[in-house]
Amino acid sequence: MATISAKLVKELREKTGAGMMDCKKALTETDGDIDKAIDYLREKGIAKAAKKADRIAAEGLVHVETKGNDAVIVEINSETDFVARNEGFQELVKEIANQVLDTKAETVEALMETTLPNGKSVDERIKEAISTIGEKLSVRRFAIRTKTDNDAFGAYLHMGGRIGVLTVVEGSTDEEAARDVAMHIAAINPKYVSSEQVSEEEINHEREVLKQQALNEGKPENIVEKMVEGRLRKYLQEICAVDQDFVKNPDVTVEAFLKTKGGKLVDFVRYEVGEGMEKREENFADEVKGQMK
């Protein structure tokens, strides 16, 4: 049997919001497998599905830049929030975003080797900024999207660049509508554009969890199937952008809102600073010592 560490219990609590003893029991029952433990808690009705971005621990900025029919969303990390608010750092983020669009670099590694208009490489530019700002800075990721003249990009930054969203709306040039949908995605955090993007494997997994949940609630087997399909539809609505109630007008779905503009959401990218990353943990005493150096 796997040893269940306090750190593992803490991680499961943060992912599910379940109580400590429930988390410990779930991990014991599943030999310390955190994904199976999440399913166990859900089947028992103790926890909801864990969010995709469980821990936000790094600092930095997300920025969206558009040029004609090309757009990019980029995340650049810093060590502290103080630097993320620094004007020089903000200018660097915009400069890097424009460089991605100009060079169409495919990876972060390839981007670092590209040459800026001043003749220096992006790698050299970052090192210069580190020297000036006094913190480690790094380009974490970026995504380029393209459209036609008949489509629209939507760009939205929340909390000064803590969250950024880039949307692509087909069949409409209404940038305001595309931005409104980007704002919706920033707030609600869907995983997919539509249910067509959800894999059969994910649907079957969710169906099985919901079935066990219903059976554990003591529901008669003859109505479980109907219940599961109803809950599955609700689950898909929660993770698919076009089926969600539009935040600016909950009386219509995102799909219906865009239809009134003659458009259709075909793609989006949502970045939240540091999602999935963990910053080094320090205890309070070490933190104070570090500040006194």
UniProtKB/Swiss-Prot annotation:
Top-rank lineage group of the source organism: Bacteria
Annotated spans, Involved in Mg(2+) ion dislocation from EF-Tu: 80-83
Keywords associated with the record: Cytoplasm, Elongation factor, Protein biosynthesis
Xref: Gene3D superfamilies: 1.10.286.20, DNA helicase RuvA subunit, C-terminal domain (1.10.8.10), Elongation factor Ts, dimerisation domain (3.30.479.20)
Compartments it resides in: Cytoplasm
InterPro entries reported for this sequence: EF-Ts_dimer_sf (IPR036402), Transl_elong_EFTs/EF1B (IPR001816), Transl_elong_EFTs/EF1B_dimer (IPR014039), Transl_elong_Ts_CS (IPR018101), UBA-like_sf (IPR009060)
Coiled coil spans: none
A GO-annotated cellular component: cytoplasm
GO biological process, one term: translational elongation
Keyword set includes Ribosomal protein: no
SUPFAM superfamilies in UniProt: Elongation factor Ts (EF-Ts), dimerisation domain, UBA-like
Pfam families named among the record's database cross-references: EF_TS (PF00889)
GO MF annotation terms: translation elongation factor activity
Protein family according to the UniProt entry: Belongs to the EF-Ts family.
Function of the molecule: Associates with the EF-Tu.GDP complex and induces the exchange of GDP to GTP. It remains bound to the aminoacyl-tRNA.EF-Tu.GTP complex up to the GTP hydrolysis stage on the ribosome.
Family matches, as PANTHER family: ELONGATION FACTOR TS (PTHR11741), ELONGATION FACTOR TS, MITOCHONDRIAL (PTHR11741:SF0)
This protein's name: Elongation factor Ts
Species: Staphylococcus aureus (strain NCTC 8325 / PS 47)
Classification of source organism: Bacteria, Bacillati, Bacillota, Bacilli, Bacillales
